[in-house]
Amino acid sequence: MESNLAGDSIPGPKWRKVAYGGMQIGYDDNYTDESFLEEMVMNANVVRRDLLKVMKDSVSISQYLCIVALVVLVWVHTLESSLDENSLLLLDLSLLASGFLILLLTEEKMLSLSLLLRYLVNISFFTTGLYILAPIYQTLTRSISSDSIWAVTVSLLLLHLFLHDYSGSTIRAPGALKTPNLTSCISVNASIVASVFVASRLPSRLHVFAVMLFSLQVFLFAPLVTYCIKKFNFGLHLLFSFALMGLTLYSIYALHRLFFLVFLSLVLLVNVVCPYWLIRMQEYKFEINGPWDEAKLCFDITD
C-alpha cells in the first residue's frame, strides 16, 4: 500500500495565464500551453473596401484638383491679357450668384432670411475692404523678381493641395460654429498668399481687385458649395465633378497639350491607380488582437 502511494506522482500546480505574479513553479518564464492563443482574433478591425466605392470617394480629390487648376488657368489668361477687368468682374458676380443659389437649393432648412442678409452684409464689407487694399497688393512685391514670385506661388499651391481637407470634416454648415484645425488654416492661408503674389504682377488696380475677389471666392467658398452638393445628392456630386473634369481638361488642352497629358495622368492616378493600389494592399494587411492588448478607454474623457 505504501509502495503504491510512493509510486504515484503528485501533479504540479496548473499553469495560469497571468501577466504579473512572478514565475510559476514547475514552468519556465516563457512557457505557454495550448490555451494561450485561444482568445486570439485575427483582422477584427480591418475594413474591407470595395474598389468602386473607393473610386467614388476619390472623385472629391480630383474635383478639387480641377477647381485649383481652373483658378490657375484664370490667372494665366489674366497675366497674358486674354481676360480683361470687365470679364473678370462678370465672372466674379456669376460665381457668387451661382454659389448662393446652390446653397439655397441644398441647404434651405439651414439658411434663413436673416442669415442670408448677414452673409450679404459681410460680403459687401469684405469686397469694399478688398477694393481699398488693391493698390497695396499691386505694389507689394515690386522689389522681388518674377521668378521668385512664380516659384513661391507654385510651392504655396502645392502646400495648399497637400493640406486641404478633402473629406469635408472641417467644413461647417451655414450658420454653424466650428473651429477649424491647424492644417486647414495653413492650407487656406497658403492659397490666399499665392493669390496675393499673382495679383501683385497685374497691371491695374481693377485687375488686382477682380483677380483677388475671384481667387478668394473659389478658395473660401467653393469647398462649402461642393460639400453641400455632395451631402444633398451623391449622384449630383458625381455629375458635377465629371463636368468639372471635362471643362478643366478641355481648357488645359486649349492652353498646352503637354500640361493636358500631365493633368490627365494625375486624374487617372487619383481616380483609378491609387484606389486599385489601396485594394491590392488590403490583401497584405494582417492584424491580431487578444488579451495581451493594451486597455482602451471606452468613454470620452472630455465629457
Swiss-Prot record:
The keyword Membrane applies. It holds the Pfam family GPI2. This is Phosphatidylinositol N-acetylglucosaminyltransferase subunit C. GO terms for cellular component: glycosylphosphatidylinositol-N-acetylglucosaminyltransferase (GPI-GnT) complex; membrane. InterPro entries: Plno_GlcNAc_GPI2 (IPR009450). It comes from the Eukaryota. Keywords: Endoplasmic reticulum, Glycosyltransferase, GPI-anchor biosynthesis, Membrane, Transferase, Transmembrane, Transmembrane helix. It comes from Arabidopsis thaliana (Mouse-ear cress). Belongs to the PIGC family. Part of the complex catalyzing the transfer of N-acetylglucosamine from UDP-N-acetylglucosamine to phosphatidylinositol, the first step of GPI biosynthesis. Required for pollen germination and pollen tube growth. Its EC number is 2.4.1.198. One of its GO terms (molecular function) is phosphatidylinositol N-acetylglucosaminyltransferase activity. The chain crosses the membrane at residues 59-79, 87-107, 120-140, 143-163, 179-199, 209-229, 234-254, 259-279. It is found in: Endoplasmic reticulum membrane. Disruption phenotype: Defective in pollen germination and pollen tube growth. The gene is PIGC. GO terms for biological process: GPI anchor biosynthetic process; pollen germination; pollen tube growth. It catalyses: a 1,2-diacyl-sn-glycero-3-phospho-(1D-myo-inositol) + UDP-N-acetyl-alpha-D-glucosamine = a 6-(N-acetyl-alpha-D-glucosaminyl)-1-(1,2-diacyl-sn-glycero-3-phospho)-1D-myo-inositol + UDP + H(+). It is a multi-pass membrane protein. Pathway: Glycolipid biosynthesis; glycosylphosphatidylinositol-anchor biosynthesis. Expressed in roots, stems, leaves, flowers and pollen grains.
